[in-house]
């Protein structure tokens, strides 16, 4: 796996009494980053997917009692694609304010959508990060500076999205499929 520069920054912010929000374009590696962070902590985690209708229904009318029952003994609560959940800001606020031993990590593809749903309820209760596609520095640390310099023109043509970078030789096909 390619180590993301944000990983260490986010790990240092965990369990500080605030939610961690990660936004960024689709397919830039948000879910993979969160999986790596959670794995690094070794702590019990509840993973919820905002795309899932059951998850949306489960969080529709949140109360601190229901959330405590849902979270159980988990100490990390991940909400992937959080912007898809109605009143997600209230859900996160209830956890941050009432279940202080639980770290909330939420991801969203659309920073505008997610920001509109969480900013007011989470004022002062969140650390926000924006994840971009892979960077030159991340790739240089992964393969080597010399190799990454050699590949720079290729990267400028096809980009630094993780799927393109990790599927060398299939870039044209991936770009065609993405349209």
Model-derived features: where do they sit?
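Pre-Walker A adenine-sensing motif
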Residues: 1-14
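Interdomain hinge/linker elements that couple catalytic modules in large macromolecular machines
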Residues: 132-179
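Conserved lysine of the Walker
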Residues: 30
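Short regulatory helix/loop adjacent to the ATP-binding pocket of P-loop NTPases
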Residues: 112-127, 143
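Hydrophobic anchor at the beta1->P-loop junction of P-loop NTPases
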Residues: 22
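Conserved catalytic/switch belt of AAA+ P-loop NTPases
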Residues: 89-112, 119-121
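Short glycine-rich substrate-engagement loop in P-loop NTPases that contacts/grips substrate
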Residues: 46-76
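Hydrophobic positions on the alpha1 helix immediately C-terminal to the Walker A/P-loop
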Residues: 33, 37
């Amino acid at each position: 796996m390619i180590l993301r520069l944000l990983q260490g920054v986010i790990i240092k912010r965990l369990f500080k009494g605030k939610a961690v929000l990660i936004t960024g374009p689709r397919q830039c590696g948000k879910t993979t980053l969160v999986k790596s962070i959670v794995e690094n902590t070794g702590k019990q985690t509840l993973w919820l997917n905002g795309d899932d209708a059951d998850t949306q229904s489960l969080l529709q009318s949140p109360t601190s009692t229901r959330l405590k029952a849902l979270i159980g003994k988990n100490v990390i609560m991940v909400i992937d694609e959080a912007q898809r959940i109605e009143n997600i800001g209230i859900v996160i606020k209830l956890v941050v304010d009432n279940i202080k031993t639980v770290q909330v990590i939420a991801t969203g593809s659309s920073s505008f959508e997610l920001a509109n749903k969480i900013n007011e309820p989470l004022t002062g209760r969140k650390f926000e990060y924006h994840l971009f596609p892979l960077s030159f520095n991340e790739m240089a640390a992964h393969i080597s500076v010399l190799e990454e310099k050699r590949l720079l023109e290729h990267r400028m043509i096809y980009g630094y999205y993780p799927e393109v970078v990790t599927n060398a030789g299939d870039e044209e096909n991936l770009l065609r499929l993405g349209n």
